[in-house]
Amino acid sequence: PVPVGGLLLNCAAVIHKGSLLGLVAKTYLPNYKEFYEKRWFTSAKDISSVDVRIAGQTVHLSSGTTLFRTGDGALFGVEICEDVWAVTPPSNRLALAGAELIFNLSASNELIGKHSYLMSLLSQQSARTMTAYIYSGCGYGESTQDVVYGGNGFIYENGVLLSRSERFSFKQQLVIGQVDIERLRTERRLNSTFAASQCGIIADVIIDTKPVTPRDFELIRSVDPHPFVPTGPELDNRCNEIFNIQVAGLAKRITHTHAENVVLGISGGLDSTLALLVCSKTFDKLNIPRSGIIGITMPGF
């Protein structure tokens, strides 16, 4: 809690090497069911930008979008708990303003079914904003009231879960993950829709020149050598999806051209075998006799 004039704000503090870099106020205050934050706090939408004296340091508290740039050049933003559950989370604007990492400080309680929904929500938000989304929730012992906290900690990269905490642990946990910021930047450059959405988005940027990782870098994340080939049950689903996409594409072409025959070069390899299976399935779905499939063997290949 940070007092500003006669108001009280629910804030996150960004601190690096003993220096308070800035404060970010919570935007969306839940006031339903077991939540009653509006009894105490004021939304960031209802304040004006102001300098705040706290812990012996003066920092700027903005009423708009605030980003932080590290000494390594990474841009990150912060939102708090309920913010990500809103229809238009602050992280949308943070990402469009340039944030590559989003940090969420949360006190979201546990309810039946809420955990799986939360994971889906964070994955979608990370993918939609093309960010690394780092979520840290309250854990065991952080409440004496009528709620339970599970100690959820997640690190997502463009929708993919990289690291997570042990749920309901009675011990303190540190969740560590490595995100590929260059990859996120590349994905954004390739996505014209993301660039088009950035028009008119501005933000205050607080710059810290101290390097975040002065020591030598050590790669600890797992890099899949076969990123396009899943393992386990998902492999069957992926192959079935590919097969049906091919069938749908061929069916559309045959229907459009009113073709009654297809001609295949059969070499005996995997490619021509798959092509033959796709043709057979397509003809069956279109109720066309398989006699219209003409295979030409090519033993020289």
Language-model regions, residue ranges each:
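Enzyme catalytic cores with a strong preference for nitrogen-chemistry domains
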Residues: 1-265, 277, 281-290
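Conserved G/P- and acidic residue-centered "switch" motifs that form tight phosphate/ATP-binding loops
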Residues: 269
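PAZ/PAZ-like end-binding module
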Residues: 273
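ATP-dependent adenylate-handling ligase core
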Residues: 288-290, 298-301
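Conserved beta-strand positions in the Rossmann-like core of class I SAM-dependent methyltransferases
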Residues: 294
